[in-house]
Structures are given as structure tokens and as C-alpha cells.
Design a protein with these regions (language model features):
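Second-shell loop/turn segments in exported
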Residues: 1-8, 23-30, 74-80, 110-115
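Surface-exposed patches in mature extracellular/periplasmic domains of secreted proteins
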Residues: 2, 27-30, 50-55, 59, ...
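Short, composition-biased local secondary-structure segments
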Residues: 3-10, 90-94
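Glycine-rich beta-to-alpha active-site loop
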Residues: 6-10, 14-69
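Charged, glycine-interspersed solvent-exposed loop segments at helix/strand-loop junctions
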Residues: 67-135
Length: 135
């Protein structure tokens, strides 16, 4: 299980290493990614999800989760999009996901509040070409 990150800069640096070395990322049947863990998963190609239970929809397995972020008592959407945190995240997702990266980042901001969680559906994944193979 890879959950949220304590340091977004290090997390994005690590993600860019995964991306630059053309590494595959895999969520195993007993694994999951959430928040910063999902950011790392995004850096791989291909991005493979091995479902915990193949009889369930992927969101019911709770293996790939996203949410917004906050800084102190301010939510991400309370910061202007010119803010360094937004620019860094948008640049990261554009780099590792291409043309759908910024739209995916915006999706995470709207998916659930920073204290909440949204487990990605197949429709979510398909819209952003996020999970490249589901097993």
C-alpha cells in the first residue's frame, strides 16, 4: 500500500525518475495506491492494475484512490492556479501523462476533498487513459 506523500517535491522527483527510466508500475491484487501513491503510479508506463477481486468493479476493490489537497486550512481550490503548488502538480502530470495530464490533475481536485477519498472507476480511468491494463 502506498498512501499519501509527506513531501510532494520528493514524490514528484521520484515519479520523474520512474518516468524517465520507463518503468512499469503495478498495483498488485493485495496492493493499493492513494493520493501521492497514485501520483507515483501515474509515472509508470504501462500502468497495470491487478484487481483484488475480479468479480467486482474496480472502485469497489479500493485500489486506486485520489483526492484534493490542502495546505493548512486552505483547500487546493482556494489557491489561484498560478500558485507554485498547482503549477508543479500540473507540470508533473503533463510530463508523465501527456495531453490528459492536466485534466487528470483537475479531476483529482474535484474528486473528493483533501480529507476524503475517491476510488477510481473504470470510466474515470478510461477518460484519462490512466490505467493502461486491468487484469
Amino acid at each position: 500500500h502506498i498512501a499519501g506523500s509527506l513531501d510532494d517535491e520528493i514524490n514528484m522527483y521520484t515519479g520523474l525518475m520512474i518516468y524517465n527510466h520507463k518503468m512499469t508500475t503495478v498495483v498488485t491484487p493485495t496492493g493499493s495506491v492513494f493520493s501521492g501513491g497514485t501520483d507515483l503510479f501515474a509515472a509508470g508506463y504501462p500502468r497495470i492494475l491487478q484487481r483484488a477481486d475480479t468479480s467486482k468493479a474496480i472502485e469497489q476493490n479500493k485500489q486506486v484512490g485520489v483526492h484534493s489537497w490542502a495546505e493548512g486550512d486552505k483547500t487546493a481550490k482556494e489557491f489561484p492556479y498560478t500558485n507554485e503548488s498547482h503549477r508543479s502538480q500540473a507540470t508533473y502530470f503533463k510530463k508523465v501523462m501527456g495531453d490528459k495530464g492536466i485534466a487528470f490533475y483537475m479531476f483529482t481536485l474535484n474528486s473528493a476533498p483533501a480529507s476524503g477519498e475517491h476510488w477510481m472507476t473504470k470510466a474515470d480511468s478510461d477518460k484519462y487513459s490512466f490505467i493502461t491494463r486491468i487484469e
